[in-house]
Amino acid sequence: MSRLGIMVLTLLLLVFIVTSHQDAGEKQATQRAAINFRWKRSLTRRTATEECEEYCEDEEKTCCGEEDGEPVCARFCLG
């Protein structure tokens, strides 16, 4: 194979490697953003009122927030 052919194949390989690396970085950033959104949502959901805490305390559980106006009780709040 001529030197020109080898150089062209090398350049094509480098372009492929660079673009696949960029795609992986974008995918990772998207996943990170989704995780951050879930984390913020779970923190928002964990805010509890005193009424909810008292209700769940009677059941010896933790108040994880309210859903449709009803207290949500569990041993551990997972979000």
From Swiss-Prot:
UniProt entry tagged with the keyword Secreted: yes
Signal sequence residues: 1-20
Listed Pfam families: Conotoxin
Propeptide: 21-44
UniProt comment concerning the protein's domains: The presence of a 'disulfide through disulfide knot' structurally defines this protein as a knottin. The cysteine framework is VI/VII (C-C-CC-C-C).
Family: Belongs to the conotoxin O3 superfamily.
Record's protein name: Conotoxin ArMSGL-0122
Species, as recorded: Conus arenatus (Sand-dusted cone)
